[in-house]
Amino acid sequence: MNRIDRRFDDLKKEGKKALITFITAGDPDIDTTYDIVLALEEAGADIIELGIPYSDPLADGPTIQASSQRALAKGIKIKDIMDLVMRIREKSDIPIVYLVYYNSVFKYGIEKFLEDSKNAGVDGLIIPDLPLEERKEVLDVADKYEIYLIPLVAPTSKERIKGITENGKGFVYCVTLTGVTGAREEITTDLEEYMRLVSSYTSMPKALGFGISGPEMARKLKSLSDGIVVGSAIVERIAKGYNRCEMLKEVKEFVLSLREVL
């Protein structure tokens, strides 16, 4: 059984929601990313979403774009991130999902990317800009290596939700708003109607993300989904430039505050 399925099954039995935490791999550096992942797990994260830095991340807001640029400026390569996951796997069995742009996968080679991801211990991929027409090719290779291609749907893609969720695995990443990522004070999309629509097409667990800024918002949204994705609000804390110990402490405290409400 894939680690993602196992985690959602366990959470369901416990009556809890999944806390999915996003960070950019290599920001501020690979060794610190390793420490952050272990700190996130310790604080109660259920799934780690590792962003592979990309020079033109269309779905990302300024916080994650800046994070990507910092990692790229350090010369981070996909191979470094594969090695990082291998290191994490020596210590942890937490589900790990890459958030990666299609061009990065294509340039690396679809088959090689999925084979290396499997060997490293990756459980799933989210490819936010994957064209629907390329989906089958990636899906076939992902299935071969038993890696889940996690569908990402948005409120604007109603007519495409069926096509995007078809054959998806793991969970559906439901974007709460149109536009780019980033912590917000409030979310104005009619989420109840949106989540009903997604549920009409798939019985997979659904996680809400994009714009979730803290525990108050997570508390309000948890009844609508099976999990919450928090990214920019964590990346902001990593970027503050504290010394390593202070930063890890603040990230852990923030994630603990999210875990408590879920």
From Swiss-Prot:
Q: Does the keyword Lyase apply?
A: yes
Question: Which positions are catalytic residues?
Answer: 49 (proton acceptor), 60 (proton acceptor)
Which pathway? Amino-acid biosynthesis; L-tryptophan biosynthesis; L-tryptophan from chorismate: step 5/5
Q: Per the UniProt record, which EC number(s) apply here?
A: 4.2.1.20
**Protein's UniProt keywords contain Amino-acid biosynthesis:** yes
What family is this protein classified in? Belongs to the TrpA family.
UniProt name for this protein: Tryptophan synthase alpha chain
Please report the organism this UniProt entry assigns to the protein: Caldanaerobacter subterraneus subsp. tengcongensis (strain DSM 15242 / JCM 11007 / NBRC 100824 / MB4) (Thermoanaerobacter tengcongensis)
Q: What is the lineage of its organism?
A: Bacteria, Bacillati, Bacillota, Clostridia, Thermoanaerobacterales
- Originating gene: trpA
